[in-house]
């Protein structure tokens, strides 16, 4: 095609007024030239300014958006030319054209200069013109349409699969002040960290030129730095010719000044993009390495392409260099030949809008020139050097360190990283290229420092072209691109479409299509940062080559949840939950969705919403999303629900106990702002409902429910990290810090260095084998292991545990809801309670019943239970409280929220006959202010009546449905009506969803029975005895059709059958009496009118004998019972919550009552082997005594109390000073409590009935060289056969009280131990120690005989063991006896055990005694210490040892008891 040539530099027109105006009104391009003082330099700058301004104006006019061609027009198109109206103007093209024009002018200027070596190589910057909203593609604006999107403003959106395309006309919603504060905080923290790292590098930067002239003027430039910056700024802001003249003068004075003046431009100028292109005129003889070395260090660290390796000293302080990585941040690196791509740019031959350079005479119709060929040319290419910081934060820090103003990075026009540039051989290209010296030619990609530069350099030539000498400069090639076109695959479409459509098009086998890369490998490697790209540029157009495709399977994307856990979106998508997950798979921040249809509830995803599926609302945080949008909501941590528990280690759950605000964005809010006190306008609420406004009007805390305007005046930054007080319901809310998630099985990190379970098992097996030599110990051990294994299999693993903080002001309430009660009102109440309380203190009874919740919160102080349902629901909760073992102490008080049909118990307690949509907050406040009362509960025992034969009635049962009476028990016509109702409801549950309809059914059945009179002979079928008195005749006289046993005054939905005027006392729910009432068919319906039944008696015990099958009911649960004998007696009294009324007494319940704990001591050897086996460790532990302590005491206070008891009481054996607590009730293993954290833990955190302490001293006792096993291991091996040996030695039956122990040939009469404190003495202890029989000594000590037994000379068992060198006996006595025994002296010589060991030269025993606290300065009757005794006996080694220990023994020492 015919090419238009640009005029030469001499033919350029003078700048006109219009040109100047356009150059001033629009952002101008200021290009730095060589520092000269001639007048030609000024003219050159003026011409360059005018030319570039005219070029920019043509570009703006050319790339004006217009109509997209139709399908018919696209079919008629035979040219490869891309219509200008189908895509936006590329900034690369603008830079390319300006660079090409500048290159030609600078080349002419350089050829006319006298010497190229004297010119400065300092380059200027090319400013990209301002891109106004109406001058760029509308697709760029769509990226910022959603302010709440994570990628807004960074990349252009390519919608996901099943996601609608974002509308370009959507208005940008106002920003959220809460999100702004969060981003500002994170940005400030990031900037501070990077500034700390880069500050030392920035302060060492040098801006001197390589020429000698620049070096001489360096000091002068630094001295006038501030003045030159002001002049440069003023020069840029001036208009028309004054702008050009000022800029030229400043550039002539100093090349650095223009660079600084350009940076001192208005920081709010939108033309300041994220890239500054430096067009450098490299001096002759210089190389790329020299040019790179002249760059500042901060910029040089991001510049690549040098052939030489950077020295270690140069890059010593640099960071972030990925070893082996193909890129630095977003910087392009040389491509790898094995990763090409098929999407390319093709170069076009024609475009009349661009002026052609005068030095490129191409003949019309000449074949396209390949970029790789070497033709002769006249113009040496200039090497553009682009310096781009890796991030905006780096740029800001670098600018601050260099004294330059900080510019905000334009993120909305970031280049698309999915587009690659490749000059192809079959495309028509208008380029000029000259012969290139292959030895000096570098790849154009080697100097590219950003994506934009890479796109430019791929078509603009080699950077090495500017590095040659003046003589050889004409032999370097330079590729100048005139037009840029797209070469994209032809999908044979009738209209323009995006290339992305081929990726979303599914074939029959559920595969997508992907472009196959070509085999040449000449492509740029783009870093994969998961960025999206524009859809308006990638237009599908016909091309000469057909693209190749391959099948790509649709793999499931990875979903990241709020707590950091990832899962596959297609395979492991989490189900939508209504109630919290209590398993180990629970996720922090999970929502609890329920369907919603309220107007004004908009999806929280805004522009990312796919608008598919039913709208769902989170019950806890009130977030709204479509059903199909929920997986995307789970991906965003900013949309997570309020935290309900703490996912930390079991040793760190007390380190952080505060709860922070959880702010949620609200588009529709009622009420008023807490800060300013103004109500939210109704106009915005109406607009939100009618038009779906996406504006965030309020910020609400999901915990305390405080509401603030989305304004800086109402919501400040301090609210983000502020502690939340949980609002008006703080006393009854369970804080998230109370609920701790336990580590999964196998992930428990014990403090023990080596936990070898196999060794422990082998050790116990050896003991069993040794003990089984006499009588089958191995078999019993196997049976024990089987029993323990069965217990472990039955025990359910726990994933959560509640660690409350005892406080008398806290009254936690756990809620049990039966969703099926009251016409399915429970589903609605479930969400309301989850919104006001912690969702983990609200339980659905259909998800396993109340046992898990009661057992989990058993240690919560002053616990209260709210049962939402009918009377059956309350009875269910009370029955589970009876079954829990060990029972809850104290038992929690139970309140009632009536949702059932009758609700007689709720009426008796003052809570009303049913829930009538009252505010849940009001009910919670009343529960917190309620008073505790006692209620009688009665046991029902049913046995078959063998005196009569079974009448074989259908569906009859041998027992009543419930064995505990809470409300009433009845048999006869009323039970028959209730049974008919239950059977009908089970058959047709849809007919009984209204409370009024249920009552009408009851009335209908009562009227039917009134006519039939089926139970008129009831008194003939039963026998009634109350407190031993027969009342059958009274039933016969009254003609009763039903008999009631009332525990509460209310019956049958609010009636009162008992007449208060009858009887000796007024009925009460805690008087221990039941009211017996007879009812006829006539009286039964008259109860609704206020009448009463026939009062029979008040009794404490009743007995009913039936002779035929009769319907019976217990608390509304009815069934037919066969002939039987029924006995009723008092079971217990339950603690209930009653609505506070004046005159009613409150039961005083002490929620923080004292705990009775057994103290068990464990040695280190036992702990290391059996910390995972609680049963074995409990058997091996040594019982020290019992302590009574308050539950709110922390462990630091408990330690002081125990130390006092250990020192003062003789009943406690010796315990070392460095003992520590063991947590025995948190995890499946025992673990130690750090002494530094004892003030954070409470006694209720680590113990229930038994308090374990770990004695380090017993485990670290000095061992003798010839000792093969410790005492703990020895005692464990003997544990299985001790009882057998004791039974053989005793020779007694299990019921005998005394025994004969045969030691040698002398029978010794001993008495059985009776007192737990005062132990009995016996000579058998001394004989066992003298003979070295450890088994006998242990057996006697366990029977209660004291180790302090002495003979007539005052010698103890320890004296004999030291004298006869029985080390096992000495070790056992030291570990089991008190401190007094170690230092006891005999009456004859006044010697202690240490005297005897030193006298007998027993070094090992001396070491053990000293370690146990034996006194070294005790004198015998001769005035000798143990050391002096050793010297007298020539035991020099022992004497030296004792002498060395005298200075190290503590002053306080071991005090005698």
Curated annotation (Swiss-Prot):
Annotated knockout phenotype: Flies exhibit photoreceptor cells that degenerate within a week after eclosion.
Reaction(s) catalysed (UniProt annotation): a 1,2-diacyl-sn-glycerol + ATP = a 1,2-diacyl-sn-glycero-3-phosphate + ADP + H(+)
Region (Disordered): 1-123, 136-177, 207-339, 758-799, 1264-1302
Biased composition regions of type Acidic residues, renumbered to the chain: 214-253
Gly residues: compositionally biased ranges: 763-778
Bias type Basic and acidic residues, positions: 254-266
Subcellular location: Membrane
Pfam families listed in its UniProt record: Ank_2, C1_1, DAGK_acc, DAGK_cat, DGKI
One GO location term (cellular component): plasma membrane
ANK repeats: 1320-1349, 1353-1382, 1389-1418, 1422-1451
Name recorded for this polypeptide: Eye-specific diacylglycerol kinase
Originating species: Drosophila melanogaster
């Amino acid at each position: 095609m015919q090419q238009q040539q640009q005029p030469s530099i001499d033919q350029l027109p003078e700048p006109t007024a219009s040109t100047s105006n356009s150059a001033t009104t629009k952002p101008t391009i200021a290009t730095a030239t060589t520092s000269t003082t001639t007048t030609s330099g000024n003219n050159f700058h003026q011409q360059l300014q005018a030319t570039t301004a005219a070029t920019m104006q043509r570009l703006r006019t050319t790339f004006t958006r217009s109509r997209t061609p139709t399908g018919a027009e696209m079919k008629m198109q035979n040219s490869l030319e891309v219509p200008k109206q189908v895509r936006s103007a590329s900034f690369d093209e603008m830079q390319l054209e300006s660079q090409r024009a500048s290159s030609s002018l600078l080349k002419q200027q350089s050829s006319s200069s006298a010497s190229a070596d004297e010119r400065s190589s300092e380059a200027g910057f090319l400013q990209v013109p301002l891109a106004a909203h109406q001058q760029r593609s509308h697709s760029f604006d769509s990226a910022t349409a959603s302010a709440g999107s994570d990628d807004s403003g960074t990349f252009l959106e390519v919608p996901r699969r099943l996601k609608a395309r974002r509308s370009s006309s959507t208005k940008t919603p106002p920003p959220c002040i809460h999100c702004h504060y969060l981003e500002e905080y994170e940005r400030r923290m990031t900037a501070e960290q990077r500034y700390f790292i880069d500050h030392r590098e920035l302060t060492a930067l040098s801006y001197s030129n390589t020429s000698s002239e620049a070096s001489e003027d360096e000091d002068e430039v630094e001295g006038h730095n501030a003045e030159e910056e002001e002049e440069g700024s003023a020069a840029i802001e001036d208009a028309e010719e004054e702008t050009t003249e000022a800029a030229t003068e400043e550039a002539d004075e100093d090349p650095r000044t223009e660079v600084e003046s350009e940076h001192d431009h208005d920081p709010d100028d939108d033309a300041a993009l994220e890239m500054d292109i430096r067009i450098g005129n490299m001096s002759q003889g210089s190389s790329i390495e020299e040019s790179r070395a002249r760059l500042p260090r901060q910029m040089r660290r991001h510049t690549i392409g040098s052939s030489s390796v950077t020295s270690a000293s140069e890059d010593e302080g640099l960071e972030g260099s990925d070893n082996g990585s193909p890129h630095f941040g977003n910087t392009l690196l040389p491509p790898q030949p094995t990763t090409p791509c098929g999407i390319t740019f093709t170069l076009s031959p024609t475009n009349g809008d661009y002026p052609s350079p005068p030095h490129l005479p191409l003949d019309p119709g000449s074949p396209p020139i390949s970029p790789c060929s070497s033709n002769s040319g006249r113009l040496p290419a200039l090497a553009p050097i682009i310096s781009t910081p890796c991030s905006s934060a780096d740029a800001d820090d670098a600018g601050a360190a260099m004294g330059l103003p900080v510019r905000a990075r334009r993120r909305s026009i970031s280049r698309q990283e999915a587009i690659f540039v490749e000059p192809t051989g079959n495309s028509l290209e208008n380029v000029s290229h000259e012969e290139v010296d292959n030895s000096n030619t570098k790849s154009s990609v080697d100097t590219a420092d950003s994506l934009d530069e890479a796109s430019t350099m791929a078509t603009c030539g080699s950077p090495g072209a500017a590095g040659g000498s003046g003589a050889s400069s004409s032999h370097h090639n330079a590729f100048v691109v005139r037009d840029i076109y797209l070469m994209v695959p032809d999908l044979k479409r009738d209209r323009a479409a995006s290339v992305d459509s081929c990726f979303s098009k599914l074939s029959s086998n559920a595969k997508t299509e992907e472009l196959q890369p070509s085999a040449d490998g000449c492509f740029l490697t783009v870093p994969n940062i998961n960025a999206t790209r524009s859809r308006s540029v990638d237009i599908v157009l016909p091309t000469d080559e057909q693209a190749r495709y391959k099948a790509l399977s649709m793999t499931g994307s990875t979903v990241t949840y709020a707590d950091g856990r990832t899962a596959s979106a297609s395979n492991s998508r989490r189900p939508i939950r209504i109630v919290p997950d209590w398993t180990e798979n629970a996720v922090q921040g999970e929502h609890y969705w329920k369907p919603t249809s309220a107007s004004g509830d908009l999806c929280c995803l805004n522009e990312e919403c796919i608008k598919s599926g039913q709208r769902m609302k989170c019950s806890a945080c009130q977030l709204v999303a479509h059903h199909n949008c929920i997986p995307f909501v789970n991906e965003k941590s900013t949309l997570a629900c309020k935290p309900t528990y703490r996912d930390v280690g079991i040793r760190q759950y007390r380190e952080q106990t505060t709860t922070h605000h959880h702010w949620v964005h609200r588009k529709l809010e009622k009420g008023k702002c807490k800060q300013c006190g103004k109500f939210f306008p109704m106009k915005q609420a109406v607009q939100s409902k009618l038009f779906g406004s996406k504006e965030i009007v309020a910020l609400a805390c999901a915990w305390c429910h405080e509401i603030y305007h989305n304004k800086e005046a109402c919501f400040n930054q301090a609210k983000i990290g502020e502690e939340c007080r949980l609002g008006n319901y703080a006393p009854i809310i369970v804080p998230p810090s109370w609920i701790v998630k336990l580590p999964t099985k196998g992930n428990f990190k014990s403090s023990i260095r080596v936990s070898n379970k196999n060794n422990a098992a082998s050790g116990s097996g050896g003991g069993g084998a040794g003990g089984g030599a006499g009588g089958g110990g191995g078999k019993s051990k196997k049976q024990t292991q089987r029993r323990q294994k069965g217990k472990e299999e039955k025990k359910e693993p726990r994933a959560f545990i509640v660690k409350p903080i005892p406080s008398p002001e806290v009254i936690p309430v756990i809620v049990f809801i039966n969703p099926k009660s009251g016409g399915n009102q429970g589903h609605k109440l479930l969400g309301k309670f989850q919104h006001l309380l912690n969702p983990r203190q609200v339980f659905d009874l259909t998800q396993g019943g109340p046992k898990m919740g009661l057992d989990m919160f058993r240690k919560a102080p002053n616990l209260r239970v709210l049962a939402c349902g009918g009377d059956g629901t309350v009875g269910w909760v009370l029955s589970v409280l009876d079954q829990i073992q060990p029972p809850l102490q104290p038992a929690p008080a139970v309140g009632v929220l009536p949702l059932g049909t009758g609700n007689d118990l709720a009426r008796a307690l003052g809570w009303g006959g049913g829930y009538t949509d009252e505010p849940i907050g009001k009910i919670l406040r009343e529960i917190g202010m309620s008073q505790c009362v006692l209620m009688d509960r009665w046991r029902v025992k049913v046995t078959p009546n063998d005196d009569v034969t079974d009448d074989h009635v259908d569906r009859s049962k041998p027992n009543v449905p419930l064995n505990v009476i809470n409300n009433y028990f009845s048999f006869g016509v009323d039970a028959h009506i209730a049974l008919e109702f239950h059977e009908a409801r089970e058959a047709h549950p849809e007919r009984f969803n209204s409370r009024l309809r249920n009552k009408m059914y009851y009335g209908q059945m009562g009227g039917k029975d009134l006519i039939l009179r089926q139970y008129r002979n009831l008194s003939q079928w039963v026998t009634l005895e109350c407190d031993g008195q027969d009342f059958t005749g009274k039933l016969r006289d009254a003609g009763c059709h039903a008999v009631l046993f009332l525990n509460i005054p209310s019956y049958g939905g609010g009636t009162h059958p008992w007449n208060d005027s009858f009887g000796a006392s007024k009925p009460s729910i805690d008087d221990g009496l039941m009211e017996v009432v007879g009812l006829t068919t006539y009286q039964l319906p008259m109860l609704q009118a206020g009448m009463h039944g026939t009062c029979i008696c008040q009794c404490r015990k009743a007995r009913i004998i039936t002779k035929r099958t009769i319907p019976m009911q217990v608390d509304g649960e009815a069934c037919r019972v066969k002939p039987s004998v029924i006995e009723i007696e008092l079971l217990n009294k339950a603690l209930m919550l009653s609505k506070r009324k004046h005159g009613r007494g409150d039961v005083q319940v002490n929620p923080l009552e004292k705990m009775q704990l057994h103290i068990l001591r464990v040695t280190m050897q036992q702990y290391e082997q059996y910390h995972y086996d609680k049963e074995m460790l409990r058997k091996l532990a040594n019982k020290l005594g019992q302590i009574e302590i308050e539950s709110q005491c922390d462990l630091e206070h408990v330690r002081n109390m125990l130390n006092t008891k250990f020192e003062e009481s003789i009943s406690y054996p010796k315990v070392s000073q460095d003992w520590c607590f063991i947590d025995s009730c948190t995890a499946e293993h025992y673990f130690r409590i750090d002494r530094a954290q004892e003030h954070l833990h409470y006694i209720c955190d680590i113990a229930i009935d038994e308090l374990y302490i770990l004695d380090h001293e017993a485990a670290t006792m000095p061992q003798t060289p010839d000792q093969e096993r410790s005492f703990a291991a020895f005692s464990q091996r003997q544990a299985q056969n001790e009882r057998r040996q004791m039974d053989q030695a005793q020779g007694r039956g299990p019921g005998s009280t005394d025994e004969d122990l045969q030691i040698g040939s002398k029978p010794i009469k001993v008495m059985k131990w009776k007192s737990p404190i005062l132990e009995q003495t016996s000579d058998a202890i001394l004989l066992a120690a003298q003979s070295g029989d450890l088994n006998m000594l242990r057996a006697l000590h366990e029977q209660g005989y004291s180790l302090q037994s002495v003979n007539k000379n005052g010698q103890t068992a320890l004296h004999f063991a030291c004298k006869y060198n029985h080390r096992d006996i000495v070790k056992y006595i030291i570990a089991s006896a008190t401190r007094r025994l170690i230092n006891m002296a005999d009456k004859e010589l006044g010697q202690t055990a240490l005297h005897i060991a030193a006298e007998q030269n027993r070094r090992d025993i001396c070491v053990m005694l000293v370690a146990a606290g034996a006194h070294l300065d005790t004198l015998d009757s001769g005035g000798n210490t143990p050391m002096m005794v050793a010297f007298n006996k020539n035991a020099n080694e022992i004497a030296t040892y004792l002498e060395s220990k005298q200075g190290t023994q503590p002053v306080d020492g071991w005090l005698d008891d």
